[in-house]
Design a protein with these regions (language model features):
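Catalytic or ion-translocation cores adjacent to nucleophile or general acid/base/metal-coordination motifs
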Residues: 1-42
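Non-catalytic, alpha-helical, charged scaffold/linker segments
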Residues: 38, 45-53, 57-58, 63-68
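Extracellular ligand-binding/catalytic regions of CAZymes and related secreted enzymes
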Residues: 1-13, 61, 66-200
Length: 200
């Protein structure tokens, strides 16, 4: 959420879903305190992280995908992120620990020859590598306040990375840490690969 500092620095304000009640709605709409990716703000978090909530949604939460696996499906197992995991194309991982859950961030995807690619239309860098995905969906009520979205629109959690000066890696889910309890489990190995590659 985009917030605004007010009251001489003593308060942070965010109108969130009630953005049309924000005083900025009648003036400089780029200062609206709502989603960064809202079409009136036009500063999608995808430009920084590669993913955002607009093309994500919920998984095992808010009544969406309540029978979901809680797992990611692998699309590019040859990537160094998956080194030492033995994962193959279309394998799932993390379901036993429900690593995909609650809020999920994604990006607009197009499929070419069986592989997902970012369209770049939502601010996601076109050199973003989509490594794994999981189904996600907005709650129908969310579409009531965000008029640019159709109710029932499907999204996904997206795990991936891109380089622009440095490397930005994202797992696109709030519940990734659930998989870290198992020493040498897949999530633990992937996390170690990332730290080993990017820490030095």
């Amino acid at each position: 959420w985009q917030v605004r500092v007010e009251d001489d620095g003593r308060a942070l304000t965010c109108w969130k879903q009630r953005f049309n009640q924000d005083p900025a709605y009648r003036g400089d709409r780029t200062a609206l305190t709502t989603l960064w990716s809202h079409h009136l703000v036009k500063r999608p978090e995808n430009q920084l992280t590669g993913v955002g909530f607009l093309h994500g949604g919920y998984h095992l939460s808010h009544g969406q995908y309540m029978d979901g696996s809680g797992a990611f499906t692998v699309h590019r197992p040859e990537h160094w992120v998956f080194s030492n995991t033995k994962l193959q194309v279309n394998d799932e991982f993390g379901g036993k620990d429900t690593i995909v859950g609650y809020e999920c961030d994604g990006c607009e995807i197009e499929w070419r020859e069986g592989l997902p690619y970012p369209t770049g239309n939502d601010g996601t860098p076109t050199n973003f590598h989509i490594l794994a995905t999981a189904s996600a969906k907005w709650h129908p009520d969310d579409s009531d306040w965000y008029d640019a979205w159709q109710p029932g629109r499907e999204g996904c959690a997206v795990m991936g990375l891109y380089q622009q000066g440095g490397t930005v890696f994202t797992v696109g889910t709030t519940d990734w840490s659930h998989g870290l309890a198992k020493l040498n489990g897949t999530v633990d190995i992937v996390t170690k690969n990332i730290i080993d590659k990017l820490a030095f």
